[in-house]
Structures are given as C-alpha cells and as structure tokens.
Amino acid sequence: MKRICSIYQSSKKSGMYLYVLKSDALERVPEGLMAAFGKAKHSFDLVLTPERKLASEDIAVVLENLEKQGYHLQMPPAEEEYIEHLPEELLRRNDPV
C-alpha cells in the first residue's frame, strides 16, 4: 500500500507533526486536535510504503492511522530523552559542591 502524505509542523509545540493524506489535506483532522495543534505549517510531502523507514515513527502505525482515522499525530520526544543527550558538564553545572 503506497500513500502520498503531507506532513505539517505545529505552531504551538516544537517537535509535534501531523501526517495526513495529501488528497485529504487537513479535512479529516478533528477540530479539537487542530485547536491544540495550532497553525499547521506545511513541512513536506512524502510517499509512504510499508518498506519505508521513518526517523522516529513506526511506519506500520502511521499507515494504519492514516487509513483508519485520516491522520497520524507525531508527538515530540519525551523531555527525559533530551536530558540524556546533554553533555555531562551541563548535567552537573548546578550541582551543589
């Protein structure tokens, strides 16, 4: 199953993206989600196939969500994941001596 998908970036939350079928645009996305998502800025279009690898999402889940509900919401990474990637110097900067 091949799908042409448009990916939009949230104006309210860094790292939050919305995947929709290009042919549907944002028509199938619920109003409540759009209110929480903010202004949708088009990032790029992508051809999705089950064989394709995505950087931070499971392609099978994305394709299933697009088929069933018409969109897939990619949430930003958890805050703990950001902290794990900080240099040791920054992690210890405010530690008491």
Curated annotation (Swiss-Prot):
Parts of the chain that traverse the membrane: none
Bridged cysteine pairs (disulfide): none
Matching InterPro entries: YcgL-like_sf (IPR038068), YcgL_dom (IPR027354)
Domain spans labelled YcgL: 3-87
Classification via HAMAP family: UPF0745
PANTHER family tied to this protein: PROTEIN YCGL
Listed name of the protein: YcgL domain-containing protein Pfl01_1389
